[in-house]
């Protein structure tokens, strides 16, 4: 059984469905007009990404834990391994995030975190479930 939790969900592109109209004219042929229409309304946008403020806080904590320069470029997409974190560093980062945000991260969840964004999403979800 699958479940999704979060404040919102984002769909970037809507699948399209095709429809057609055929017209018979006096000539012995048929002309078909194809039209593609979106299945979802264009204005619908849902997102499950953590707020930018949360990503910034998590980035700052990660930079501090790894003793990175203050001006080091760390974004939500940055993987811990790309900035020199090994498995022990990742455990220490998760422990610091738990302490800083007052949440408890299950071990199996902690092992799945590979990016700043994933950590921020997890912390935000845990705070909402408090």
Curated annotation (Swiss-Prot):
Record PTM: 4'-phosphopantetheine is transferred from CoA to a specific serine of apo-ACP by acpS. This modification is essential for activity because fatty acids are bound in thioester linkage to the sulfhydryl of the prosthetic group.
Transit peptide: 1-48
Subcellular location: Plastid, Chloroplast
Keyword annotations: Chloroplast, Fatty acid biosynthesis, Fatty acid metabolism, Lipid biosynthesis, Lipid metabolism, Phosphopantetheine, Phosphoprotein, Plastid, Transit peptide
Tissues in which the protein is found: Roots, leaves and seeds.
Sequence ranges assigned to domain Carrier in this UniProt record: 52-127
Alphabetical list of InterPro entries matching this protein: ACP, ACP-like_sf, ACP_chloroplastic, PP-bd_ACP, Ppantetheine_attach_site
GO molecular function: acyl carrier activity
Pathway: Lipid metabolism; fatty acid biosynthesis
A GO CC term attached to the entry: chloroplast
SUPFAM superfamilies xrefs: ACP-like
Residue ranges of the TM segments: none
Residue list for modification O-(pantetheine 4'-phosphoryl)serine: 87
Function: Carrier of the growing fatty acid chain in fatty acid biosynthesis.
Similarity annotation: Belongs to the acyl carrier protein (ACP) family.
Protein name: Acyl carrier protein 2, chloroplastic
Organism: Spinacia oleracea (Spinach)
Organism placement in taxonomy: Eukaryota, Viridiplantae, Streptophyta, Embryophyta, Tracheophyta
Gene that this polypeptide is encoded by: ACL1.2
């Amino acid at each position: 059984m699958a479940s999704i939790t979060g404040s919102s969900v984002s769909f970037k592109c809507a699948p399209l469905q095709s429809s057609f109209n055929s017209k018979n004219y006096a000539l012995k042929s048929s002309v078909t007009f194809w039209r593609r229409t979106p299945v979802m309304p264009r204005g619908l946008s849902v997102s499950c990404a953590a707020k930018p403020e949360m990503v910034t806080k998590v980035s700052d904590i990660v930079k501090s834990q790894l003793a990175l320069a203050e001006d080091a470029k760390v974004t939500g997409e940055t993987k811990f391994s790309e900035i020199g974190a090994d498995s022990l560093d990742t455990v220490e980062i998760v422990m610091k995030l738990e302490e800083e945000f007052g949440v408890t991260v299950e071990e199996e969840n902690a092992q799945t975190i590979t990016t700043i964004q994933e950590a921020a999403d997890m912390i935000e979800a845990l705070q909402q479930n408090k």
